[in-house]
Amino acid sequence: MTPVIQTEIAFKPCDLLNTRYEGWLADRLEINVEKRLLKLDLDMILEPFVNRPGKQWWAGEHVGKYLHAATHAWRFTQDERLASDMKSVVKRLIDTQLSNGYLGTYKESDQFRQGDGLNWDGPVWDVWTHKYNLIGLLSYYKTMRYEP
């Protein structure tokens, strides 16, 4: 059945790879790349994965957030330094994945369970880290056509 009233599509996504930014927005994008993404201590955000549970067992989402932001920034800038950093982070992150597929920061006794091993009996947010890892890795994969 055809609707009585035809709706018009109000939103059409733009082609971000072929969009050129100028002025204030272009300046902000460049500052974000130069002053944040290229300056971020990548060893620090990978440390909780390399040395589970790390200094802060709850701080694992930053790698995924970095990859998501850096991938989108790269789409605008095509900055090869950023591409190189992202490639390194992806490889290093994937290298920390356990044989059972686990890609988080918690020690084995706390993975997807209650408690944190430090006398805390409440829920742990292990899924939080995985969520952001997947968002970041999928953003990277889609844009950079990553093949393991």
Give a label for each model feature.
Residues 1-148:
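Glycan-recognition and catalytic cores of secretory/periplasmic carbohydrate-active enzymes
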